[in-house]
């Protein structure tokens, strides 16, 4: 044990123990082995130190060179070379000692005193521990013990004969160590690595081919071991020279020796390199250089002949690798952990190992096994201990590096070490052969072949097993190296094996190249890198993209938005710039103003601040904005800044505006409200008074903007993000606003109304400003009541409004927010329109004026979730006002359309200006859109009035842009100043967001209208549609009821949807500007004002039909035909639009008219977005008949479906293609929403239009109403009252508008359910849909009542019935599609779907088209939709409303269907986008959609606005 101690000293001194401790059990064992080796070194000290010095100095040419090369005896292959030289005098030279270690042991050189004793004891220790130490040695001298077992046949039969003897000894010491196990013991240190290492050797060294080669090698090795065959020497020379032939001829001996020498040469190079370069460099150098040299210089150098051997060996190895790739790769997979590999290795070990065990054991035992083992093991162990101390440091570094697991593998991986041992031996032998030439290399080789081969033979049990092929040593080495490579890859075996299978040839090449180890080191790391590079980048890529898409554009837009601008001249260009950037900049500016105003209002009335807090940018929105990270918050800032501006404006009208107006902010807001009221009211009124008022309010507006652009605006944005806080505050503000707002708003509103009333008096001369002020106060109170569900519930939806109002109050967190948003979207819109119908009718202007004042607060309100709730409520109020405006406006409108429009314009203008919510309020009040549109229409005679109002807005607040005028008003100087041009596109979306949010209860209708708005954005097809559909809908949910949670949910949903949908988050980002279109509703208002200009005729028709809803619905049916037959966008259409908004706001919101069922909303989305093109086409084909109207609808839809492509194109496509009901449910819902808007606007819209306007106007509008009603149907979604009108026109549609709206929201939500990303929102939306459904079920009579009066519109009783709604909700899209298909009121939707199911749709059209049947134009349009495949495309486009969801669902469900739909939609989208005028009209229609929502809320301005939008979109 002195040797063990010495070896332990050497091992510890040389780091052998530590390195060998790669397998910790090799530590002590390797210490034993190191002691043994050291004792052997001591025994061979006289001889060994010189060779050690020689080897170290000479790179360990033979004996010790392999030892450094392969920490253990692997370096002894030169020792076998030395053995060949000195096997005769094996005990004399260091190489002889090394050779005695190697072959002297095979010869029985018991030079050391540890032949049998230390063999047994130390090597027994080496067997259990010493073999692990040999494993450690195999690690440090892997070619010694493990490779000693493997290579000891060649290098020093030291472990192997020793192991053969030692097999007896080891079997004595370790009964588990059979001869085959001894190789494993050498490999395994006889403990953990017995079977595993032997298996490792068998696997690494012995592949199935190697097994046969191992047998051959055993046979050859037997002669070699028994004799130092000169023939084998010559074979070896021949192998060196002609390895390809001789190695195979040599088979086991020659090949083993050759591969052995070759490996030794390779690893001697490696050892030299390793000794010189500390193994790591050498490994790399040798692997790259020598491997390449060996691989490529096979035939060139002596190593070239080695390389030939290596190549032949490689070829054999290729065979083996083929097996390896098959079996061995499997085994390699097991090799990941050698204990598991042991199972595989013992198989081979058992196979060829048993053969080799007997043969090798007997042979190795019969040779000087005990002497050789003990002595050579001693000498070799000494050498090893000495050189291992050096070489193991380096080589085990190399081995630890190559076999990074080898130190750990040394237990299980002595085969690897044997491989290393063997390869270093072979490499050293080859190097020594190169060094010695062939002379003593041959003799050494033969001796080494005899001894090392005997050793290898014993190891050939497993090693030759492994390398059974002709070149068993090389096969062994390569088998082992290959397995080592595999084992090195074992860490990455899962990767490397596959890569191995891929790179088997490459690996074979690499493997035969010098050192497999180094090939392993190099090759495996490469593979690892590849694997690592492959997977993480993909994952990281998506993660980065998702986050980047979510945040980049938002951040960029936020960055682009100069929040530092306190004062911004809201020129049309700047508004366009802002709108393009995002609503953010102008929104922030407005919010700064608002915050300044809010600061005033907060300073003056805390109730205002409370109210302002929900809408307050400072309190409520600013924290949420920061809370909502830029990804969600910023995009939603973009979305909701406009919508918040608008929604917050209406909410602030109801909330902040009332409160702010109640205080200094009210004074400021009074100016501001006057400003907004003036711009809106002034456009509705005369230009002069408008200009006068605008001048004052413009200054105030600038003031407010200056203030708002400051920090408070960003706080407002933060508050926008802080939806939960905003929502809670919104609820608080609702409570406080309900209580204090009515008072505060009343008195400050009186102030503001004083100025605004004066303004209004100027603006709206025909309208009684006092009553307007009273109405405005009432509307303010009603808006406060908006927060108070029952305060302003003047109509049936009031219960629903109460519920809806209560729903927005529901705090429930994010999910609840989703639920609330969803539920509030439908229910709140119902409740809101019913809620404030009368008060907002008269107070709409007041609210509008106040909205002007709180337009800055509007942002606050919109920013707040409470504002969303308020927005919903205010939307509901708008619907209530819409209903009341049906009552009030018919009087006004009937009295004088101009005056009515002026009133509406004043109301809408202030409301829209104040807030999107105000715009929603007005829009929801059928007055609002007329106000939004009518001020233009009334004062300007339609376009002029719109332009006047718009010009007023331009002059005062906005660059004069008809489209942006309303945006300007809606933004209350803050919203639209930056968003006039793009906001126009986005305004419809914002209208979809906020106006639709109340109409759509911020969820489905919002999504539908948002989709429509998005659909309008042909250019923003994916972006706008997606954001409008995902974000807008969700933003409705968020903006209306839960800005905080739903924004998050929208963002979360959108982001996830974007990511699943091939980065529709790019659309998300793009749609963030579409979300930016939150202002878009304002622009849509402006566009609606433009449309109001077109609404002139609509204004004319508005007054009478508003009250006679059924009558108007009659007219809608009749006049719808006319309008469809005639120009869909005639003044009558505009009037019809105007009235459609009013009626639809009341009915649709309340009843959630069957638009959803009818797919009127998708159609409406299409119509809304396509309204310009579609209504355009309808206008021309309207007269032509159903086909022409269908074509126009189709084309318009195609155009608008461009923007609506996601939402609308998809829903119709979903209607037809949307076979998976649940999958298509949401999308189908979106389609229903769009078609509901179309049909609801077409029918309910035309009905509402008829209600608002005279029957003729309504008829015209209804003709356009098919598309325009569809456009309005998003409103009708939210506007049950409006749909009630629409349902009177098409009772089924009314029912379906309510039920379908509920289902539309439901379907939209279900569509979200379809979306993987929308799961949470789908849950919430589904719950919200159920709630909305129940809410809609609470108010189903609302629409049915309205439709009942209309004989033309046979309201399908189930359409609005709870049963039908329940079925819709339950069936979701299927029920919705059934409704859409089955109910004629779903004409447009069914038309969309009918195009795919014409018979269905025809029946449905007949059913859902009672109004349409009565409304020839729209009915024809429905039928055209049914019959016209263009309209089918439009239906597909109509399904585009949830196109982003469709795209998501594309990924999530019915991919083929969605793909087809998407293809069709995209084609149509492309067509729509290609159609510039269509795109412009689409954008206009999108804006018009917003305006239509407003108009639906207010007047059903949509048809007029459609026409106007068509014109203006063309213009724009």
Curated annotation (Swiss-Prot):
**Biological processes per GO annotation:** negative regulation of cell adhesion mediated by integrin; negative regulation of cell-cell adhesion mediated by cadherin; negative regulation of cell-matrix adhesion; negative regulation of neuron migration; nervous system development
Q: Which cysteine residues pair off into disulfide bonds?
A: none
The coiled-coil regions, if any, are none
Q: Where is this region: Disordered?
A: 380-440, 589-610, 1158-1225, 1373-1419, 1437-1479
Ranges of biased composition (kind: Basic and acidic residues): 380-405, 1456-1479
- Keyword Protein transport found: no
Top-rank lineage group of the source organism: Eukaryota
List all Polar residues biased stretches.
Answer: 596-610, 1158-1170, 1185-1194
Q: What start and end residues bound the annotated signal peptide?
A: none
The record's section on InterPro entries has:
DUF4683, Nexmif
UniProt subcellular location? Nucleus; Cytoplasm
**Where does the entry say this protein is expressed, by tissue?**
Highly expressed in fetal and adult brain, predominantly in the cerebral cortex and the cerebellum. Also expressed in other tissues but to a lesser extent.
Query: Which Pfam families does the UniProt entry name for this protein?
Result: DUF4683
According to the UniProt entry, which residue ranges have a biased composition of type Basic residues?
1443-1453
- Alphabetized UniProt keyword annotations: Chromosomal rearrangement, Cytoplasm, Developmental protein, Disease variant, Intellectual disability, Neurogenesis, Nucleus, Transcription, Transcription regulation
One Gene Ontology term, aspect cellular component: nucleoplasm
Illness association: Intellectual developmental disorder, X-linked 98: A disorder characterized by significantly below average general intellectual functioning associated with impairments in adaptive behavior and manifested during the developmental period. XLID98 patients show delayed psychomotor development, absent or poor speech development, and postnatal growth retardation, often with microcephaly. Some patients show autistic behavioral features, such as stereotypic hand movements and repetitive behaviors.
Q: What does this protein do?
A: Involved in neurite outgrowth by regulating cell-cell adhesion via the N-cadherin signaling pathway. May act by regulating expression of protein-coding genes, such as N-cadherins and integrin beta-1 (ITGB1).
Protein's name in the database = Neurite extension and migration factor
Give the species this sequence originates from. Homo sapiens
The upper taxonomy is:
Eukaryota, Metazoa, Chordata, Craniata, Vertebrata
> Quick one: which gene encodes this?
NEXMIF
């Amino acid at each position: 044990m002195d040797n063990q101690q010495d070896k332990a000293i050497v091992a510890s001194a040389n780091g052998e123990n530590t390195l060998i401790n790669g397998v910790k059990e090799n530590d002590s064992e390797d210490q034993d082995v190191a002691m043994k080796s050291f004792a052997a070194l001591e025994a061979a000290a006289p001889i060994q130190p010189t060779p050690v010095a020689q080897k170290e100095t000479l790179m360990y040419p033979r004996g010790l060179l392999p030892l450094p090369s392969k920490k253990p005896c692997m370096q002894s292959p030169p020792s076998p070379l030395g053995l060949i030289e000195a096997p005769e005098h094996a005990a004399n030279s260091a190489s002889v000692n090394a050779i005695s270690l190697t072959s002297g042991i095979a010869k029985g050189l018991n030079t050391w005193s540890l032949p049998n004793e230390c063999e047994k004891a130390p090597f027994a220790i080496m067997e259990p521990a010493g073999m692990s130490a040999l494993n450690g040695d195999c690690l440090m001298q892997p070619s010694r013990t493990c490779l000693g077992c493997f290579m000891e046949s060649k290098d020093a039969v030291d472990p192997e004969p020793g192991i053969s003897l030692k097999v007896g000894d080891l079997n004595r010491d370790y009964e588990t160590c059979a001869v085959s196990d001894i190789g494993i013991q050498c490999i395994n240190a006889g403990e953990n690595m017995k079977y595993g290492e032997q298996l490792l050797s068998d696997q690494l060294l012995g592949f199935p081919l190697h097994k046969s080669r191992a047998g051959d090698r055993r046979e050859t090795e037997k002669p070699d071991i028994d004799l130092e065959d000169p023939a084998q020497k010559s074979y070896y020379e021949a192998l060196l020279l002609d390895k390809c032939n001789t190695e195979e001829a040599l088979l086991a001996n020659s090949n083993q020796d050759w591969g052995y020498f070759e490996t030794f040469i390779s690893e001697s190079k490696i050892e030299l390199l390793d000794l010189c370069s500390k193994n790591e460099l050498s490994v790399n150098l040798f692997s790259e250089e020598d491997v390449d040299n060996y691989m490529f210089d096979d035939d060139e150098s002596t190593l070239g002949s080695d390389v030939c051997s290596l190549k032949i060996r490689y070829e054999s190895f290729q065979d083996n690798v083929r097996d390896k790739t098959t079996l061995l790769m499997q085994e390699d997979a097991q090799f990941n952990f050698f204990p598991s590999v042991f199972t595989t290795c013992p198989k081979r070990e058992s196979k060829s190992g048993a053969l080799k065990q007997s043969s090798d054991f007997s042979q190795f035992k019969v040779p000087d096994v005990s002497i050789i083992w003990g002595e050579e093991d001693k000498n070799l162990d000494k050498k090893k201990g000495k050189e291992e101390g050096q070489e193991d440091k380096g080589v085990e570094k190399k081995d630890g590096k190559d076999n990074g697991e080898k130190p750990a593998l040394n237990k299980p991986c002595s085969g690897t070490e044997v491989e290393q041992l063997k390869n270093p031996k072979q490499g050293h032998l080859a190097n020594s052969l190169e060094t010695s030439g062939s002379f003593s290399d041959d003799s050494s080789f033969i001796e080494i072949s005899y001894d090392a081969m005997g050793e290898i033979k014993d190891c050939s049990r497993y090693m030759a097993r492994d390398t059974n092929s002709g070149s068993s040593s090389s096969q062994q080495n390569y088998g082992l190296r290959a397995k080592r490579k595999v084992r090195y890859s074992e860490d990455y075996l899962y990767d490397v094996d596959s890569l191995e299978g891929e790179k088997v040839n490459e690996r074979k090449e690499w493997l035969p190249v010098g050192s497999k180890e180094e090939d392993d080191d190099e090759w495996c790391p490469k593979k690892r890198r590849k694997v690592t590079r492959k997977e993480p980048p993909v994952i990281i890529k998506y993660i980065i993209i998702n986050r980047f898409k979510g945040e980049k554009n938002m951040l960029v837009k936020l960055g682009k938005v100069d929040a530092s601008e306190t004062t911004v001249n809201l020129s049309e260009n700047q508004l366009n710039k802002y709108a393009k950037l995002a609503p953010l900049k102008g929104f922030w500016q407005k919010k700064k103003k608002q915050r300044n105003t809010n600061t005033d209002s907060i300073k003056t009335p805390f109730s205002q601040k409370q109210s302002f807090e929900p809408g307050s940018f400072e309190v409520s929105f600013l924290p949420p904005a920061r809370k909502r990270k830029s990804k969600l918050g910023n995009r939603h800032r973009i979305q909701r800044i406009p919508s918040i501006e608008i929604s917050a404006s209406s909410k602030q009208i109801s909330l902040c505006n009332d409160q702010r107006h109640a205080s200094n902010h009210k004074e400021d807001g009074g100016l501001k409200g006057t400003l907004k009221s003036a711009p809106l009211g002034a456009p509705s009124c005369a230009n002069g008074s408008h200009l006068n008022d605008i001048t004052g309010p413009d200054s105030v507006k600038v003031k407010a903007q200056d203030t708002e652009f400051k920090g408070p605006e960003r706080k407002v944005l933060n508050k926008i993000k802080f939806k939960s806080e905003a929502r809670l505050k919104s609820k608080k503000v609702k409570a406080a606003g309900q209580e204090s707002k009515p008072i505060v708003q009343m008195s400050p509103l009186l102030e503001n109304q004083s100025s605004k009333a004066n303004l209004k008096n100027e603006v709206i001369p025909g309208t009684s400003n006092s009553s307007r002020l009273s109405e405005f106060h009432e509307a303010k109170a009603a808006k406060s009541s908006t927060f108070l569900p029952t305060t302003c519930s003047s109509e049936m939806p009031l219960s629903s409004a109460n519920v809806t109002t209560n729903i927005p109050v529901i705090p429930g967190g994010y999910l609840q927010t989703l639920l609330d948003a969803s539920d509030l979207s439908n229910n709140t819109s119902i409740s809101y329109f019913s809620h404030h119908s009368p008060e907002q009718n008269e107070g709409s202007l007041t609210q509008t004026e106040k909205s002007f004042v709180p337009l800055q607060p509007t942002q606050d309100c919109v920013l707040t979730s409470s504002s969303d709730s308020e927005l919903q409520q205010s939307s509901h109020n708008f619907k209530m006002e819409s209903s009341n405006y049906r009552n009030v406006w018919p009087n006004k409108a009937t009295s004088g359309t101009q005056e009515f429009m002026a009133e509406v314009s004043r109301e809408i203008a202030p409301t829209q200006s104040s807030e999107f919510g105000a715009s929603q309020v007005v829009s929801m009040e059928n007055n609002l859109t007329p106000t939004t549109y009518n001020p233009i229409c009334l004062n300007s005679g339609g376009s002029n009035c719109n332009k006047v109002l718009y010009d007023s807005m331009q002059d005062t607040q906005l660059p004069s842009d008809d489209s942006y005028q309303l945006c300007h008003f809606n933004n209350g100087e803050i919203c639209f100043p930056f968003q006039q041009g793009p906001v126009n596109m986005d305004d419809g979306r914002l209208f979809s967001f906020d106006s639709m949010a109340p109409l759509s209860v911020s969820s489905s209708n919002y999504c539908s209208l948002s989709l429509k708005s998005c659909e309008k954005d042909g250019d923003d097809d994916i972006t706008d549609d997606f954001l409008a559909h995902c974000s807008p809908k969700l933003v409705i949910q968020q903006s209306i009821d839960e800005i905080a949670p739903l924004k998050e949910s929208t963002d979360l949903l959108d982001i996830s949807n974007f990511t699943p949908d091939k980065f529709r988050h790019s659309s998300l980002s793009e749609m963030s500007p579409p979300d930016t279109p939150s202002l878009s509703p304002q622009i849509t208002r402006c566009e609606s004002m433009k449309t109001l200009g077109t609404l002139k005729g609509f204004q004319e028709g508005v007054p009478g039909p508003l009250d006679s809803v059924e009558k108007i619905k009659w007219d809608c049916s009749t006049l719808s035909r006319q309008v469809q037959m005639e120009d869909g966008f005639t003044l009558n259409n505009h009037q019809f639009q105007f009235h459609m908004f009013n009626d639809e706001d009341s009915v649709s919101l309340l009843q959630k008219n069957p638009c959803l069922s009818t797919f009127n909303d998708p159609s409406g989305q299409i119509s809304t977005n396509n309204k310009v093109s579609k209504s355009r086409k309808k206008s021309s084909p309207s007269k032509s008949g159903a086909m022409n109207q269908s074509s126009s609808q189709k084309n318009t839809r195609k155009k608008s479906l461009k923007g609506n492509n996601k939402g609308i194109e998809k829903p119709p496509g979903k209607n037809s293609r949307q076979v998976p009901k649940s999958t298509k449910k949401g999308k189908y819902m979106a389609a229903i929403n769009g078609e509901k808007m179309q049909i609801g606007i077409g029918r309910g819209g035309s009905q509402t239009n008829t209600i608002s306007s005279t029957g003729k106007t309504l008829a015209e509008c209804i003709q356009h109403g098919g598309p325009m009603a569809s456009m309005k149907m998003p409103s009708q979604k939210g506007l049950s009252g409006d749909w009630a009108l629409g349902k009177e026109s098409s009772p089924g549609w009314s029912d379906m508008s309510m039920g379908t709206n509920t289902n539309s929201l439901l379907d939209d939500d279900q569509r979200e359910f379809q979306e993987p990303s929308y799961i949470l929102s789908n849950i919430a939306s589904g719950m919200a849909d159920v709630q909305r459904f129940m809410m809609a079920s609470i108010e189903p009579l609302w629409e049915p009542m309205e439709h009942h009066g209309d004989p033309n519109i046979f309201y399908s009783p189930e359409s609005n019935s709870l049963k039908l709604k329940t079925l819709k909700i339950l069936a979701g899209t299927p029920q919705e599609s059934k409704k859409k298909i089955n109910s004629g009121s779903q004409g447009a939707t069914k038309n969309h779907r009918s195009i795919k199911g014409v018979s269905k749709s025809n029946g449905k059209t007949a059913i859902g088209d009672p109004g349409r049947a009565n409304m020839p134009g729209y009915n024809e349009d429905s039928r055209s939709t049914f019959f016209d495949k263009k309209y089918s495309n439009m239906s597909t486009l109509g399904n585009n409303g949830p196109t982003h969801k469709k795209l998501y669902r594309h990924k999530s469900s019915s991919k083929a269907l969605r793909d087809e739909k998407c293809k069709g939609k995209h084609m149509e989208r492309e067509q729509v986008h290609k159609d510039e005028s269509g795109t412009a009209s689409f954008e206009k229609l999108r804006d018009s959609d917003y305006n239509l929502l407003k108009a639906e809320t207010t007047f059903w301005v949509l048809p007029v606005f459609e026409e106007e939008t068509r014109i203006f979109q063309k213009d724009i």
